[in-house]
Structures are given as C-alpha cells and as structure tokens.
Curated annotation (Swiss-Prot):
The lineage of its organism: Archaea, Methanobacteriati, Thermoplasmatota, Thermoplasmata, Thermoplasmatales. CDD domains: KH-I_Rrp4_prokar, S1_Rrp4. Belongs to the RRP4 family. It comes from the Archaea. Residues 60-129 form the S1 motif domain. Gene3D superfamilies: 2.40.50.100, K Homology domain, type 1, Nucleic acid-binding proteins. GO terms for molecular function: poly(A) binding. This is Exosome complex component Rrp4. It holds the Pfam family KH_1. Residues 137-195 form the KH domain.
Amino acid sequence: MEIRQIVYPGEKIDLEGQKPRNGLYEENDEYYSEYFGVVQKSDKFIDIVPFNGPYMPRINDKVIGKVIDVSATMWTVDINSPYFSLMHMNDTPWHVTSGDLRKYLNVGDYIYAKVSILNEIKESWLSLKDVNLRKLEEGSIIYIKAPKVPRVIGKAGNMINMIKSETNTKIIVGQNGLIWIDGEPENVDLAINAIGMVEKEAHTFGLTDRVKAYLDKMKGGNNGRSEVNQ
C-alpha cells in the first residue's frame, strides 16, 4: 500500500508546474502547506488535504444540513460547522408564507442546499434554488471528516460513481462531510462500509481499485453489517 506524501504546516511544496489551489499559502514567491495532511495532485492543480479539521463553508458549496430551529420566516440549519446557517423562506422553491414554515421543513429534517451568502463573521445563508437541491426524504445520513470529502468523491467523481454503481444506491455527498444514501438496506450497508474504507485509507494510492475489489468480494459472499455510525 503506497502512502501519499505527508506534509506539515509551513513545509515548502514543489508545484512541479501545477497550480496551487486549497491548503497552500504564498511567501516570497514560494508555496507552503497550511496543514498537517497529504499532497493531492490532479491534472492541473495541487491541494493539501488536512487529516482533520472542521468544515468551513465557502460560497457555492453544496452541503447537507439538519434543521434545528424554525422561526416565522427562516430555518436554522446545522451544517457540521462551528457556525450554524440560516435559510430564508424566499430561498426555497416553495410558495411559503410567514408562519407556516413547518409545513415544508420541520426540526429534524435534512436538506441538500447551497451556500449562497457568507459574511465576514462566517455566518452563512443557504438556498434550495438550484438544480437537484431539495429536502432529503428517506435514506440514511452518515458523517465523515470534511477534509476526506474530495477523496470520497474522487477525480471527476470516479470514486463515488463507482460506489453508487457497484452498490446500486443513490448517494449525495455534501462538501461538509454529511452523506445521504438510499437503496435496499443491504446495499446501503455495503456503500457505507466502502465509504468508511475510503475515509480510513484516504492517504494511500490505488484506493479506487482496492475499494472496487472489496465490493466485488462482498457482493460475491455474505455482506457484513455497517461499521460506520449512521
């Protein structure tokens, strides 16, 4: 099992012709790592993926959140961040009137939403006005560490698309580390275990092939129950 390059905060990063993106800072025309994590390279970009850390919202991030409060005109949503988010009734596809918000979303409901506004004190506002954004019905919600989300999605979506195809499940990955999975119970369990494997081994090479081999093996025998908390 080959390990990706591990770097420490302040460690100089050789870009090798690629463009810096996330987790790097510039000083005197050189680039350095912001985090203790691993180097992740794509065709054009280089990122530092931290091993740990809270989710910090960014404009246009698509996240999964849980409604924790309902007022006359807006919902308060937990998006797995140090700061709660708000969503105004006008930022939904429904014709909502003040005072009847619980007819549409109540405490405990989950949504797949977009971060539409982010202010200087990290307050964020969500919107459901975009393609595929909606209230999440049925299914299971699991949690992974937010820094591992890019690895679960994979390059051009190859990892998560493979897991969906091999397990015959519907999966939505929020950039905040919450994941919605729907399908037959045994298939959902298999998808959860595969995602847990990706999270655990995110710092290694050849992971897509190993996860595929694991799924092939499990589908050929008796599936085990999930080892990841739902």
